Amino acid sequence: YLGVVKKEWNGFNILQTSAGRTGALDIGFIPSKKGLNAKQIFSKADEGDLSFIWLMGVDNKDVLKLKKPFVVYQGHHGDVGAHIADVILPGAAYTEKSATYVNTEGRPQLAKQATFPPGDAKEDWKIIRAFSDYVKNKLPFDDLESLRNKLYDEFPHLGDIDEIKKARWSKFGTKGKIDNIELKSSIENFYNTCSISRTSETMAICLNNNINKIAAE
């Protein structure tokens, strides 16, 4: 017993390896009963059982394994996902759109557009809304306000901007043996964890300085 969760203090949290994962989990963005998780998707794609994959800003190195399916990439900064895609739908970075985010505490936050997306890039919801028209399955919103109203109707806590909702705890985990292996961070390089930081000259300098510092030690 670690004693990190008490009535007067909650010292337990999870640092997700993807910035959008906390918000995605909040709206139930997980595989359905007959759905596949990420590992299974890559495995099925490699076996030739999946013919089509739509990457929503997915830029981790695992996407390089997608050799067989037809790949649509929606994102920005031309990162790994764009390099292997058959079709690219240029999206907007967080500075180029107004959006709702959820931080690692579970606190909903609003971001306001600071600049316009370059070229033909569009806000992500506009891309998906346009595609829904193309496949004749129109989504029930036409602007950001109606989209947010729909979001807040289904997930009211996301409308409580800058507030943290008390977590509903339940039992989790399973019993099992712990392997005798080294515990280490799942993130090897904190300077290049997303498509924006990987194209940043400043972060490249920080990374090189850190590498040189470690080498000197």
Regions found by a protein language model. Give the residues of each.
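Long, low-complexity segments enriched in small/aliphatic residues
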Residues: 148-217
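Non-catalytic alpha/beta scaffold blocks inside enzyme catalytic domains
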Residues: 1-165, 213-217
